C-alpha cells in the first residue's frame, strides 16, 4: 500500500480492524502478575521503544517503593532540630512570687497586720485553718467599712480627661492572708494596673510604662 495514498480498499480496512481487535484481545487475555505485566516480553514486536522505556521506568519506581516500605511501612522520621532552652532569670519572669506573709516579703514593700485573736475560740483539726482565714477576711471587710482608704488611682502626671487621650496607669491594692499556729497576718501591697490578677500572691512590674512608681497607698509600705 502506498503510504501517500489515503484511500483504503475494503480488504485493507478489514485487515486494519482485524489487527486492532487482535491486539486488544491479546492484552485483555493476559494475566496481570504485578511488575511482570509491563515487561518487554508482554509488548508485541513492532511497538516503538518509547513504550518499553516507560514500562521499565514504571517497574523501577514500583520496586523502589516496595523496598522503602519494608519493615512495617513506616517512613523514617527526619531528625528535628534541637531547641535551646535558656534558663530564665528574675528579669524575664513575668510574676515574682511573694513569700509567706508570716516570714516577711524579702525587700518587697508591703504592710503587715497581726490580728488580735485574744478571746477567740479556735477549733482543732482541719477546720482550724478555715476559721483563721475567716477571721482574716472579717478583718479586711471591717477595715474597709470603718477606715475607708483613699482613691488608689494615682498617676505620675495630672489627670487630663480630654477625649481620646489615655489617663495613664494606676496601682491596684492586693491582699494576702497567712497563718502559722494561732497567729494570723494580713499582708497588703500594690501592683500596677497593667499586671494580671492571680490567685497566688505575686509582685509584678509595670509593662505599660504608664503606671506610677508609688501611689498614696504604697508610699507608706515598708
Swiss-Prot record:
The record's Gene Ontology cellular component field reads: host cell cytoplasm
**Does the UniProt entry include the keyword Zinc-finger?**
no
Organism this protein belongs to:
Parainfluenza virus 5 (strain W3) (PIV5)
Q: What does the protein in this record do?
A: Plays an essential role in the inhibition of host immune response. Prevents the establishment of cellular antiviral state by blocking interferon-alpha/beta (IFN-alpha/beta) production and signaling pathway. Interacts with host IFIH1/MDA5 and DHX58/LGP2 to inhibit the transduction pathway involved in the activation of IFN-beta promoter, thus protecting the virus against cell antiviral state. Efficiently blocks type I IFN signaling following infection by behaving as a substrate receptor for CUL4-DDB1 E3 ligase complex and targeting host STAT1 for proteasomal degradation.
Residues that hold Zn(2+) 1 according to the record: 171, 190, 215, 218
GO biological process entries: symbiont-mediated suppression of host cytoplasmic pattern recognition receptor signaling pathway via inhibition of MDA-5 activity; symbiont-mediated suppression of host JAK-STAT cascade via inhibition of STAT1 activity; symbiont-mediated suppression of host JAK-STAT cascade via inhibition of STAT2 activity; symbiont-mediated suppression of host type I interferon-mediated signaling pathway
Family assignment?
Belongs to the paramyxoviruses V protein family.
The name of this protein is Non-structural protein V
Give GO terms: molecular function aspect only: metal ion binding; RNA binding; ubiquitin-like ligase-substrate adaptor activity
